[in-house]
Amino acid sequence: MADDSALYEKYPLLNLLHTPPHRPPPLQCPPAPRKTACRRRLGSEHVDRPLTTPCVWPTSDPWTVQSTTSSLTITTSTKEGTTVTVQLRL
């Protein structure tokens, strides 16, 4: 077996058979933020109730913005006359 060292010198990749691969240390993940206490919503809170005075913002652009307690609606028209409405439910 004295020829083994000569064999490893001639074929250095043979060292990989007996050498464990280098493993980098595991990454340390930052701890998760603490969960804040929250209260449970009532069933009546899920209804889309309009505000006592609906909010409509006049703008210089041809945009209409309306909001309720749980949604925001933006409406505009293109130059071609197509009406575009985007509604975001909160």
UniProtKB/Swiss-Prot annotation:
Phosphorylated by host ERK. The phosphorylation triggers a structural change that enhances keratin binding and protein stability. It is found in: Host cytoplasm; Host nucleus. GO terms for biological process: symbiont-mediated arrest of host cell cycle during G2/M transition. Keywords: Early protein, Host cytoplasm, Host G2/M cell cycle arrest by virus, Host nucleus, Host-virus interaction, Modulation of host cell cycle by virus, Phosphoprotein. Disulfide bonds: none annotated. It comes from the Viruses. GO terms for cellular component: host cell cytoplasm; host cell nucleus. Transmembrane segments: none annotated. Its main location: host cell. InterPro entries: Papilloma_E4. Pfam families: Pap_E4. Contributes to multiple aspects of the viral life cycle including viral genome amplification, suppression of suprabasal cell differentiation and egress of newly formed virions. Induces host cell cycle arrest at the G2 phase by associating with and preventing the nuclear entry of host CDK1/cyclin B1 complexes. Inhibits cellular DNA replication by preventing loading of host replication licensing proteins MCM2 and MCM7 onto chromatin. Within the cytoplasm, associates with host kinase SRPK1, a splicing factor regulator, and inhibits its activity. Assembles into oligomeric complexes. Interacts with host CDK1. Interacts with host SRPK1; this interaction may favor expression of late viral transcripts. Interacts with host cytokeratin components KRT8 and KRT18. Belongs to the papillomaviridae E4 protein family. The major E4 form is first synthesized as an E1^E4 fusion protein from spliced E1^E4 transcripts, such that the first few amino acids of the E4 protein are derived from the N terminus of E1. This is Protein E4.
